[in-house]
A protein has these predicted regions:
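Extended, charge-rich alpha-helical scaffolding segments
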Residues: 2, 15-104
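Short terminal interaction segments
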Residues: 2, 100-183
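Intrinsic-disorder-associated, low-complexity terminal segments enriched in Asp/Asn/His/Tyr and depleted
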Residues: 5-8, 13
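Short helix-onset patch at the extreme N-terminus, typifying the N->h transition
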Residues: 7-8, 28-32, 178
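Hydrophobic alpha-helical segments
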Residues: 11, 68-70, 156
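Generic cytosolic/nucleocytoplasmic N-terminal low-complexity/intrinsically disordered segments
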Residues: 12, 17, 136-137
Length: 183
């Protein structure tokens, strides 16, 4: 067994007598705090992205999006850690692995039950805010895309090209049009 493995640590017996390790609950709580901080950071990064979108400074949009993706990767890693710790707590509580945080809170002894419920409530609040902000950012991107396409369409009326003799063609000649297919 590697040093620091949970099986090396002595289990403490909580007052309810189920033999639940306070260490397991403490480790789960630590992982939950980390995940909460990451969700708050994601919320901040989404707000930054929104500020970039609303300010029209799209030059920084790629950077803002990359920062959001970086935080999302960190959240995925934290979720894996949370899953491992939550399964360990579930087993110690006599539950099947894969239980929800609410189910763990319902079966955990005091004061852990309140702490786990508080984490769950915070996650619900944060994910609601994140979903609303992400939806708003998608809407801003869609509006920006439509505005760009409308601008490009208005440019088509004044596009002039050259004929084989090198003379410009009139705008009424619709044989050539400016079209950006990347949109």
């Amino acid at each position: 067994m590697p040093p620091g493995d949970r099986r090396d640590r002595p289990a403490t017996n909580p007052p309810h007598g189920k033999g639940l390790s306070a260490m397991a609950l403490s480790e789960l709580s630590d992982v939950l705090w980390t995940e909460r901080r990451l969700l708050e950071l994601l919320l901040f990064k989404l707000e930054e992205e929104q500020l970039v979108l609303t300010s029209g400074r799209t030059r920084w949009l790629a950077h803002a999006t990359r920062e959001v993706e970086t935080v999302l990767d960190q959240i995925r890693d934290a979720e894996l850690g949370r899953s491992v710790e939550a399964d360990a707590v579930a087993l110690e509580l006599g539950l099947e692995p894969g239980q929800s945080l609410q189910a763990l809170a319902a079966h955990a002894p005091a004061p852990w039950d309140d702490l786990l419920q508080a984490h769950r409530d915070a996650f619900v609040q944060l994910t609601t805010e994140i979903a609303q902000l992400a939806d708003g950012n998608r809407e801003l991107l869609a509006m920006s895309h439509r505005a760009t396409q409308e601008t490009l369409m208005s440019l088509q009326e004044s596009v002039q090209t050259y004929d084989p003799q090198g003379h410009t063609t009139a705008a009424a000649d619709r044989s050539a049009q400016l079209l950006d297919r990347s949109f």
